[in-house]
């Protein structure tokens, strides 16, 4: 109530001292401030149950750090940029975002950036999208000791390189592949698996490209099972022997490795990677309702693409989500073969996206362009006079700043720029 009283007093004071356009600018800023403090549904859920999460779930430091970031994402008191129109005095404050992959807004932006970076690596050939899954009995080992997730990457990398080495005659053909770790299934439960984008061909040491159209999935399944179980046995020790023996017995044909039915064409590579490899754990659009105690969300079941809606207790929903937050500095995306090395001979390869086009692709990921393409309006065009707004002030380091001071400084700069225009 004190803040709203301050606003009313401030507007009355301004009415007698500045032109009406400046008053409209202040009101516009105030409305924008209120708009940006409307939380999305995930922020609301985690804010309502913050103490319960902290003191009953005992989250990992990485989980707590990302929860704090996500809750405060878009909070103007943590800093931002003030834009102003030098023609009419209209002001617009754009708060900084948290840049957490766990945040639905920033996670989507992160996915866009990573998708673009991955697409710049790809050679201009078809790529096969393979998914390497594990036995359900092994999942808890990766949950209890997250360093074991490295075994998944090592196993997939060794298997793909061995697959191509078996095809080699007298030349050493090396494929390029990108591995992306997903720890979630569509129902948000813990289900670590690797998505791997593999070039349909390999590059020899003497600059010769060999196309490969057939992948031996029998070999991939058996080799991946063997490589992973051996890696885990070395890491865990003798206590893992019984589990390993049971996996060999129950999966005599290897762990399930399958290919997506549609291949990754060079012309649509960015869209393909974004759809299958770059997606966040859950989008806010999949959360249907939140009552305070229960959360309803939906997904299409993997087995038959059947629409499924689940309603579960809110704390169960939170537990399902936060377990997918990786440890700090853990790499969820890794490159192998051609895409992991930097040799002068590899520069002869024709890339799917040329260096001349990369600037254009990066532009689509910028805040202003992304808003324009997604919502159809330019956020830096003044809604009153349709002129481009300019930046007046930046507050950073997520330190809290008094909004009255922010307003006074911004107005002072706005007057100075308009008088010199």
Regions found by a protein language model. Name each.
Residues 4-6:
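Serine-biased, low-complexity intrinsically disordered segments, primarily in secretory-pathway proteins
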Residues 2, 14-16, 21-421:
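Beta->alpha loop/short-helix hinge microenvironment recognizer with preference
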């Amino acid at each position: 109530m004190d803040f709203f009283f301050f606003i009313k007093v401030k507007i009355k004071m301004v009415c007698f001292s500045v032109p009406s356009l400046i008053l409209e600018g202040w009101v516009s800023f105030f409305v924008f401030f209120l708009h940006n403090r409307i939380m999305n549904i995930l922020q609301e859920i985690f804010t309502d149950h913050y103490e319960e999460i902290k003191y009953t779930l005992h989250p990992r430091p990485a989980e707590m750090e990302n929860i704090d970031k996500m809750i405060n994402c878009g909070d103007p008191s943590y800093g931002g940029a003030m834009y102003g129109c030098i023609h009419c005095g209209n002001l617009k404050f754009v708060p900084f975002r948290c840049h957490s992959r766990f945040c639905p807004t920033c996670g989507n932006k992160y996915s866009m950036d990573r998708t673009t970076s991955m697409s710049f690596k790809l050679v201009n050939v078809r790529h096969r999208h393979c998914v390497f899954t594990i036995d359900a009995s092994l999942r808890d080992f990766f949950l209890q000791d997250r360093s074991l997730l490295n075994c998944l990457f090592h196993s997939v990398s060794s298997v793909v390189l061995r697959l191509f080495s078996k095809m080699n005659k007298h030349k050493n053909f090396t494929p390029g592949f990108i591995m992306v770790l997903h720890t979630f299934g569509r129902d948000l439960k813990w289900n670590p698996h690797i998505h791997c984008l593999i070039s349909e061909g390999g590059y020899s040491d003497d600059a010769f490209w060999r196309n490969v159209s057939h992948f031996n999935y029998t070999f991939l399944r058996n080799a991946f099972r063997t490589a992973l179980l051996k890696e885990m046995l070395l890491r865990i020790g003798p206590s893992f022997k019984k589990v390993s023996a049971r996996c060999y017995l129950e999966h005599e044909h290897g762990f399930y490795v399958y290919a997506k039915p549609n291949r990754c064409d060079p012309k649509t590579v960015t869209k393909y990677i974004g759809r299958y490899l770059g997606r966040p754990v859950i989008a806010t659009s999949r959360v249907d309702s939140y009552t305070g105690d229960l959360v309803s969300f939906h997904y299409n079941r993997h087995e038959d693409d059947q629409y499924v809606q689940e309603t579960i207790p809110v704390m169960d929903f939170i537990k399902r989500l936060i377990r997918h937050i990786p440890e700090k500095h853990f790499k969820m995306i890794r490159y192998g073969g051609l895409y992991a090395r930097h040799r002068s001979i590899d520069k002869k390869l024709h890339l799917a996206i040329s260096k001349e086009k990369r600037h254009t692709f990066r532009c689509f990921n910028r805040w202003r362009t992304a808003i324009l393409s997604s919502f159809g309006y330019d956020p830096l065009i003044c809604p009153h006079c349709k002129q481009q707004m300019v930046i007046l002030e930046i507050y950073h380091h997520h330190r809290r700043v008094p909004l009255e001071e922010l307003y006074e400084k911004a107005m002072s700069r706005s007057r100075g720029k308009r008088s010199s225009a």
